[in-house]
A protein has these predicted regions:
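Non-heme di-metal
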Residues: 1-158
Length: 158
């Protein structure tokens, strides 16, 4: 197979992924608004379409990334993405908003950057738990609840 990297097709896949991802979010917001306004059937159709768009985006994502990685790989990728967002992207966006006099937007960018930093820390902690085998283990007694049946267990391991 030809090399995808640097090709127009790669750029098109990235645009398709971005477009489908944005459409999914937009339709989810539209569904929420329709539901609040009492248009349940319309909300359901927006949600159904949002789920379709999610699946379309997944096709393009898998082609761009040769599938979906392991949980360990995905946690690292997520942490790195969050790091970029809070250290570079939102920092630059906030500076530019300040320069242009959009103080309220600059503050929002700065606030979201702080949240992205927390996201990075959370992903890195989860990654460490996976690497050390501590996902289902705690140092002190913890309440564990089965996500399937709801059974409650108290102990240091799930």
């Amino acid at each position: 197979m030809k090399e995808l990297k640097g090709s127009k097709t790669e750029a098109n896949l990235m645009a398709a992924f971005a477009g489908e991802s944005q459409a999914r979010n937009k339709y989810t917001y539209f569904a929420s608004k329709a539901r609040k306004e009492g248009f349940v059937q319309i909300a359901d159709i927006f949600e159904e379409t949002a789920n379709n768009e999610k699946e379309h985006a997944k096709i393009w994502f898998k082609l761009l990334h040769n599938g979906i990685g392991s949980t360990e790989d995905n946690l690292l990728a997520a942490a790195e993405g969050e790091n970029y967002e809070w250290t570079d992207m939102y920092k630059q966006f906030a500076e530019e908003a300040h320069e242009e006099g959009f103080e309220n937007i600059a503050k929002l960018f700065e606030g979201v950057a702080k949240i992205e930093k927390e996201h990075e820390e959370r992903y890195r902690a989860l990654l460490e738990n996976v690497k050390t085998g501590a996902v289902f283990e705690r140092k002190s007694e913890t309440v564990w609840q089965c996500a399937n049946c709801g059974h409650i267990y108290v102990g240091t391991t799930a």
